Protein backbone atom coordinates (compact mmCIF):
# COMPACT_ATOMS: atom_id res chain seq x y z
CA UNK A 1 0.00 0.00 0.00
CA UNK A 2 2.80 2.41 0.93
CA UNK A 3 4.59 1.72 -2.38
CA UNK A 4 1.40 2.54 -4.30
CA UNK A 5 1.00 5.78 -2.36
CA UNK A 6 4.63 6.73 -3.06
CA UNK A 7 4.10 6.07 -6.76
CA UNK A 8 0.96 8.22 -6.77
CA UNK A 9 2.79 11.00 -4.93
CA UNK A 10 5.67 10.90 -7.43
CA UNK A 11 3.27 11.12 -10.36
CA UNK A 12 1.45 14.05 -8.75
CA UNK A 13 4.73 15.91 -8.21
CA UNK A 14 5.67 15.28 -11.84
CA UNK A 15 2.44 16.82 -13.17
CA UNK A 16 3.88 20.35 -13.37
CA UNK A 17 6.70 19.03 -15.57
CA UNK A 18 4.30 17.11 -17.81
CA UNK A 19 2.45 20.38 -18.36
CA UNK A 20 5.67 22.37 -18.84
CA UNK A 21 7.01 20.16 -21.62
CA UNK A 22 3.75 19.14 -23.32
CA UNK A 23 3.83 20.15 -27.00
CA UNK A 24 7.45 21.31 -26.56
CA UNK A 25 10.42 19.92 -28.48
CA UNK A 26 13.17 18.03 -26.65
CA UNK A 27 16.17 16.92 -28.72
CA UNK A 28 18.22 14.04 -27.34
CA UNK A 29 21.71 13.18 -28.58
CA UNK A 30 22.37 9.48 -28.03
CA UNK A 31 25.83 7.94 -28.24
CA UNK A 32 28.84 6.66 -26.34
CA UNK A 33 28.66 3.66 -24.04
CA UNK A 34 24.91 4.16 -23.68
CA UNK A 35 24.61 2.67 -27.18
CA UNK A 36 26.61 -0.44 -26.32
CA UNK A 37 24.93 -1.67 -23.13
CA UNK A 38 21.59 -3.26 -24.10
CA UNK A 39 20.01 -2.70 -20.66
CA UNK A 40 20.97 0.97 -20.70
CA UNK A 41 19.69 1.34 -24.27
CA UNK A 42 16.33 -0.18 -23.38
CA UNK A 43 16.02 2.10 -20.34
CA UNK A 44 16.68 5.17 -22.50
CA UNK A 45 14.22 4.11 -25.20
CA UNK A 46 11.50 3.39 -22.62
CA UNK A 47 12.04 6.88 -21.19
CA UNK A 48 11.73 8.35 -24.69
CA UNK A 49 8.46 6.51 -25.26
CA UNK A 50 7.08 7.89 -22.00
CA UNK A 51 8.09 11.41 -23.02
CA UNK A 52 6.27 10.94 -26.32
CA UNK A 53 3.21 9.51 -24.55
CA UNK A 54 2.79 12.60 -22.34
CA UNK A 55 2.83 14.89 -25.38
CA UNK A 56 6.50 15.88 -25.74
CA UNK A 57 7.92 16.19 -29.26
CA UNK A 58 10.99 14.01 -28.82
CA UNK A 59 13.72 14.03 -31.48
CA UNK A 60 16.42 11.37 -31.16
CA UNK A 61 19.75 12.07 -32.90
CA UNK A 62 22.46 9.41 -32.84
CA UNK A 63 26.03 8.77 -33.86
CA UNK A 64 27.54 5.52 -35.03
CA UNK A 65 28.86 4.08 -31.80
CA UNK A 66 31.23 1.21 -32.57
CA UNK A 67 29.31 0.25 -35.72
CA UNK A 68 31.31 2.50 -38.06
CA UNK A 69 34.66 1.23 -36.80
CA UNK A 70 33.50 -2.39 -37.09
CA UNK A 71 32.36 -1.92 -40.68
CA UNK A 72 35.56 -0.13 -41.69
CA UNK A 73 37.57 -2.96 -40.17
CA UNK A 74 35.50 -5.55 -42.02
CA UNK A 75 36.26 -3.85 -45.34
CA UNK A 76 39.91 -3.29 -44.32
CA UNK A 77 39.61 0.47 -44.47
CA UNK A 78 42.45 1.84 -42.36
CA UNK A 79 41.85 5.09 -40.50
CA UNK A 80 44.19 8.07 -40.66
CA UNK A 81 43.80 11.13 -38.47
CA UNK A 82 44.71 14.79 -38.99
CA UNK A 83 44.44 17.00 -35.88
CA UNK A 84 42.18 14.42 -34.24
CA UNK A 85 39.78 14.14 -37.19
CA UNK A 86 39.41 10.96 -39.24
CA UNK A 87 40.48 11.40 -42.87
CA UNK A 88 37.46 10.22 -44.86
CA UNK A 89 37.64 9.14 -48.49
CA UNK A 90 34.53 8.49 -50.57
CA UNK A 91 34.39 4.76 -49.74
CA UNK A 92 34.74 5.46 -46.01
CA UNK A 93 31.93 8.03 -46.19
CA UNK A 94 29.66 5.48 -47.90
CA UNK A 95 30.53 2.80 -45.33
CA UNK A 96 29.90 5.24 -42.47
CA UNK A 97 26.46 6.03 -43.92
CA UNK A 98 25.74 2.30 -44.22
CA UNK A 99 26.60 1.80 -40.54
CA UNK A 100 24.73 4.90 -39.37
CA UNK A 101 21.58 4.77 -41.46
CA UNK A 102 21.46 1.07 -42.29
CA UNK A 103 22.46 -0.61 -39.04
CA UNK A 104 22.27 1.75 -36.05
CA UNK A 105 19.28 3.81 -37.18
CA UNK A 106 17.10 0.89 -38.18
CA UNK A 107 18.05 -1.02 -35.03
CA UNK A 108 16.81 1.89 -32.90
CA UNK A 109 13.58 2.14 -34.89
CA UNK A 110 13.07 -1.60 -34.50
CA UNK A 111 13.67 -1.43 -30.74
CA UNK A 112 11.23 1.45 -30.26
CA UNK A 113 8.52 -0.45 -32.14
CA UNK A 114 9.29 -3.62 -30.16
CA UNK A 115 8.78 -1.66 -26.93
CA UNK A 116 5.32 -0.58 -28.06
CA UNK A 117 6.02 2.78 -29.67
CA UNK A 118 6.41 4.06 -33.20
CA UNK A 119 9.43 5.59 -34.92
CA UNK A 120 10.55 6.83 -38.32
CA UNK A 121 14.24 6.65 -39.11
CA UNK A 122 15.90 9.14 -41.46
CA UNK A 123 19.44 10.30 -42.08
CA UNK A 124 20.75 13.81 -42.46
CA UNK A 125 20.78 13.41 -46.23
CA UNK A 126 16.99 12.92 -46.40
CA UNK A 127 15.29 16.16 -47.38
CA UNK A 128 18.71 17.84 -47.11
CA UNK A 129 18.13 17.80 -43.35
CA UNK A 130 21.85 18.29 -42.62
CA UNK A 131 23.57 20.33 -45.31
CA UNK A 132 27.37 20.27 -45.22
CA UNK A 133 30.52 21.24 -47.08
CA UNK A 134 34.05 19.82 -46.85
CA UNK A 135 36.14 21.20 -44.00
CA UNK A 136 39.36 20.89 -45.99
CA UNK A 137 40.87 18.92 -48.86
CA UNK A 138 43.20 17.12 -46.43
CA UNK A 139 40.26 15.55 -44.59
CA UNK A 140 38.33 14.47 -47.67
CA UNK A 141 34.66 13.87 -46.95
CA UNK A 142 34.62 15.28 -43.43
CA UNK A 143 31.93 17.93 -43.43
CA UNK A 144 31.19 21.22 -41.74
CA UNK A 145 27.47 21.79 -41.25
CA UNK A 146 26.29 24.80 -43.23
CA UNK A 147 22.50 24.57 -42.78
CA UNK A 148 19.74 22.58 -41.14
CA UNK A 149 16.44 22.04 -42.98
CA UNK A 150 14.16 20.64 -40.25
CA UNK A 151 10.93 20.31 -42.26
CA UNK A 152 11.12 16.51 -42.40
CA UNK A 153 11.38 16.36 -38.59
CA UNK A 154 8.47 18.76 -38.17
CA UNK A 155 6.31 16.55 -40.40
CA UNK A 156 7.19 13.42 -38.41
CA UNK A 157 6.41 15.28 -35.17
CA UNK A 158 2.83 15.70 -36.39
CA UNK A 159 2.42 11.90 -36.17
CA UNK A 160 2.68 9.43 -33.30
CA UNK A 161 6.24 8.50 -34.33
CA UNK A 162 9.57 9.49 -32.81
CA UNK A 163 11.97 10.87 -35.46
CA UNK A 164 15.27 8.98 -35.23
CA UNK A 165 18.05 10.88 -37.02
CA UNK A 166 21.34 9.43 -38.27
CA UNK A 167 23.95 12.20 -38.28
CA UNK A 168 25.21 12.21 -41.86
CA UNK A 169 25.44 15.31 -44.04
CA UNK A 170 24.95 16.02 -47.72
CA UNK A 171 26.55 18.72 -49.84
CA UNK A 172 25.04 20.85 -52.57
CA UNK A 173 27.25 18.73 -54.84
CA UNK A 174 25.25 15.65 -53.78
CA UNK A 175 28.21 14.13 -51.94
CA UNK A 176 27.86 12.51 -48.51
CA UNK A 177 29.90 13.99 -45.65
CA UNK A 178 30.84 12.66 -42.25
CA UNK A 179 29.70 15.22 -39.64
CA UNK A 180 30.14 15.38 -35.88
CA UNK A 181 27.06 13.88 -34.21
CA UNK A 182 27.14 16.25 -31.21
CA UNK A 183 27.28 19.25 -33.54
CA UNK A 184 24.51 17.85 -35.74
CA UNK A 185 22.23 17.26 -32.76
CA UNK A 186 22.83 20.71 -31.29
CA UNK A 187 22.27 22.42 -34.65
CA UNK A 188 19.00 20.50 -35.07
CA UNK A 189 17.96 21.59 -31.57
CA UNK A 190 18.68 25.20 -32.47
CA UNK A 191 16.83 25.00 -35.79
CA UNK A 192 13.77 23.56 -34.04
CA UNK A 193 13.99 26.18 -31.24
CA UNK A 194 13.85 23.23 -28.86
CA UNK A 195 12.83 23.78 -25.26
CA UNK A 196 15.68 21.55 -24.21
CA UNK A 197 18.66 19.72 -25.70
CA UNK A 198 19.91 16.71 -23.74
CA UNK A 199 23.35 15.40 -24.57
CA UNK A 200 23.83 11.91 -23.17
CA UNK A 201 27.45 11.12 -22.36
CA UNK A 202 29.52 8.82 -20.17
CA UNK A 203 30.03 11.29 -17.33
CA UNK A 204 27.63 12.90 -14.87
CA UNK A 205 28.07 16.39 -16.28
CA UNK A 206 30.47 19.29 -15.66
CA UNK A 207 32.89 19.62 -12.76
CA UNK A 208 34.87 22.55 -11.46
CA UNK A 209 37.65 20.11 -10.62
CA UNK A 210 37.05 16.75 -12.31
CA UNK A 211 36.65 14.05 -10.94
CA UNK A 212 36.05 15.57 -7.48
CA UNK A 213 32.33 14.94 -6.84
CA UNK A 214 32.22 17.91 -4.46
CA UNK A 215 32.93 20.16 -7.45
CA UNK A 216 30.01 18.86 -9.55
CA UNK A 217 28.07 21.69 -11.22
CA UNK A 218 24.26 21.39 -11.18
CA UNK A 219 23.59 24.52 -13.23
CA UNK A 220 25.69 27.07 -15.09
CA UNK A 221 25.13 29.95 -17.50
CA UNK A 222 27.06 30.67 -20.69
CA UNK A 223 29.21 33.39 -19.10
CA UNK A 224 30.47 31.14 -16.32
CA UNK A 225 30.84 28.29 -18.77
CA UNK A 226 33.24 30.42 -20.80
CA UNK A 227 35.27 31.04 -17.65
CA UNK A 228 35.61 27.29 -17.06
CA UNK A 229 36.83 26.80 -20.62
CA UNK A 230 39.38 29.63 -20.33
CA UNK A 231 40.59 28.26 -17.00
CA UNK A 232 41.01 24.85 -18.69
CA UNK A 233 38.78 23.16 -16.14
CA UNK A 234 36.86 21.33 -18.86
CA UNK A 235 38.49 18.23 -20.33
CA UNK A 236 39.39 18.05 -24.01
CA UNK A 237 36.67 15.53 -24.91
CA UNK A 238 33.98 17.78 -23.45
CA UNK A 239 35.02 20.96 -25.28
CA UNK A 240 33.44 20.03 -28.68
CA UNK A 241 30.18 19.25 -26.86
CA UNK A 242 30.28 22.63 -25.11
CA UNK A 243 30.99 24.47 -28.36
CA UNK A 244 28.08 22.69 -30.02
CA UNK A 245 25.74 23.62 -27.16
CA UNK A 246 26.83 27.27 -27.22
CA UNK A 247 26.14 27.55 -30.95
CA UNK A 248 22.68 26.02 -30.59
CA UNK A 249 21.77 28.38 -27.74
CA UNK A 250 22.67 31.37 -29.87
CA UNK A 251 20.45 29.87 -32.62
CA UNK A 252 17.37 29.70 -30.39
CA UNK A 253 17.77 26.71 -28.08
CA UNK A 254 16.19 27.22 -24.64
CA UNK A 255 18.34 25.07 -22.36
CA UNK A 256 20.87 22.26 -22.63
CA UNK A 257 21.70 19.43 -20.25
CA UNK A 258 24.78 17.22 -20.06
CA UNK A 259 23.58 13.91 -18.66
CA UNK A 260 25.08 10.51 -17.82
CA UNK A 261 23.18 8.15 -20.09
CA UNK A 262 24.29 5.12 -18.08
CA UNK A 263 22.10 6.06 -15.10
CA UNK A 264 18.80 4.13 -15.22
CA UNK A 265 15.93 6.41 -16.30
CA UNK A 266 18.22 9.45 -16.30
CA UNK A 267 15.93 11.25 -18.77
CA UNK A 268 12.88 10.96 -16.52
CA UNK A 269 14.84 12.02 -13.46
CA UNK A 270 16.18 15.06 -15.30
CA UNK A 271 12.95 16.25 -16.86
CA UNK A 272 10.35 15.30 -14.26
CA UNK A 273 11.98 15.89 -10.86
CA UNK A 274 12.99 19.06 -9.00
CA UNK A 275 16.59 18.00 -8.47
CA UNK A 276 17.42 16.69 -11.92
CA UNK A 277 20.48 14.60 -12.69
CA UNK A 278 23.02 16.32 -14.90
CA UNK A 279 24.42 19.79 -15.53
CA UNK A 280 21.93 22.32 -16.89
CA UNK A 281 23.32 25.03 -19.15
CA UNK A 282 21.20 28.14 -19.67
CA UNK A 283 21.54 31.67 -21.00
Swiss-Prot record:
Q: Where is this site: Transition state stabilizer?
A: 29, 241
Q: Keyword Cell inner membrane: yes or no?
A: no
Q: In which pathway does it act?
A: Amino-acid biosynthesis; L-arginine biosynthesis; N(2)-acetyl-L-ornithine from L-glutamate: step 2/4
Q: Which chemical reaction does it catalyze?
A: N-acetyl-L-glutamate + ATP = N-acetyl-L-glutamyl 5-phosphate + ADP
Q: What is this protein called?
A: Acetylglutamate kinase
What InterPro entries is this protein classified in? Answer: AceGlu_kinase-like_sf (IPR036393), AcgluKinase_fam (IPR004662), ArgB (IPR037528), Asp/Glu/Uridylate_kinase (IPR001048), Glu/AcGlu_kinase (IPR001057), NAGK-C (IPR041727)
Primary subcellular site in the record, as a coarse category: cytoplasm
Q: What does this protein do?
A: Catalyzes the ATP-dependent phosphorylation of N-acetyl-L-glutamate.
Q: Where does the record say this protein resides?
A: Cytoplasm
Pfam families recorded: AA_kinase
Extract one GO BP annotation from the record: L-arginine biosynthetic process
Q: Which CDD domains match?
A: AAK_NAGK-C
Q: Which family does it belong to?
A: Belongs to the acetylglutamate kinase family. ArgB subfamily.
Amino acid sequence: MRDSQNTAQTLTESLKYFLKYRDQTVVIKYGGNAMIDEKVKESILKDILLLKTVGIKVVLVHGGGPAIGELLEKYEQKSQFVQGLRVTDKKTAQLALTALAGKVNKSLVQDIIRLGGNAIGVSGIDGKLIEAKPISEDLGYVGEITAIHPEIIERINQTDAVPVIASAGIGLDGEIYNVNADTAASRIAGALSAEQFILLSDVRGLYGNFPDEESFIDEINLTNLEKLVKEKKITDGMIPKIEAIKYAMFEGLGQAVLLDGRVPHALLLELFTDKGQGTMINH
